[in-house]
Curated annotation (Swiss-Prot):
Its cofactor is Zn(2+). Residues 49-139 form the ATP-cone domain. This is Transcriptional repressor NrdR. It comes from the Bacteria. The keyword Metal-binding applies. The keyword Signal does not apply. Negatively regulates transcription of bacterial ribonucleotide reductase nrd genes and operons by binding to NrdR-boxes. It comes from Prochlorococcus marinus (strain MIT 9515).
Length: 159
């Protein structure tokens, strides 16, 4: 590993520990030339995953896009930033386990909806309204019915 200050490639490991819930190894190193101490992380390299879009195009899987979309759905809820990142990490793990190299964007959307339904009902409704392109109140009502198992009369009295 190259020292960030003197560019020497000789260093010794002072300490190693598991990081990122076991997905990486954090190593504390010391340069043998200048004695500068620095930290490195070692992770398993994964194959890039292509997302097949509805229009037929492909793009590389981008975890940040999921964080952004889910963060919008979770605004003004009790879902913390850390919980969102943990949630996205779990979605990413499922994608890596379930797919070879390609996954449809619709599959990612359904994984997110399935997870949000368990985690936060408000975020689920918000995400579903964008993902499923709700056109009006009827779409919200039918989603609320499926979420709560309520009758139309009960929901109509609420609305």
């Amino acid at each position: 590993m190259q020292c960030p200050t003197c560019q020497n490639t000789d260093s010794r490991v002072l300490e190693s520990r598991s990081a990122d819930t076991g997905k990486s190894v954090r190593r504390r190193r010391e340069c043998l030339n200048c004695s500068f101490r620095f930290t490195t992380y070692e992770r398993v390299e994964t194959m890039p995953i292509s997302v097949l879009k509805k229009d037929g195009s492909r793009e590389l899987f981008n975890k940040d896009k999921l964080v952004t979309g889910i963060s919008r759905a979770c605004e003004k809820t009790t879902f913390s930033r850390e919980a969102i990142i943990d949630f996205v990490d779990s979605i990413e793990s499922q994608i890596i386990q379930d797919s070879n190299k390609d996954i449809k964007s619709s599959q990612i959307g359904e994984l997110i909806l399935k997870g949000l339904r368990k985690e936060n009902e408000v975020a689920y409704i918000r995400y579903a309204s964008v993902y499923r392109k709700f056109n009006g109140v009827k779409d919200f009502v039918s989603t609320l019915e499926s979420l709560k198992g309520s009758s139309k009369n009960e929901l109509a009295s609420i609305l």
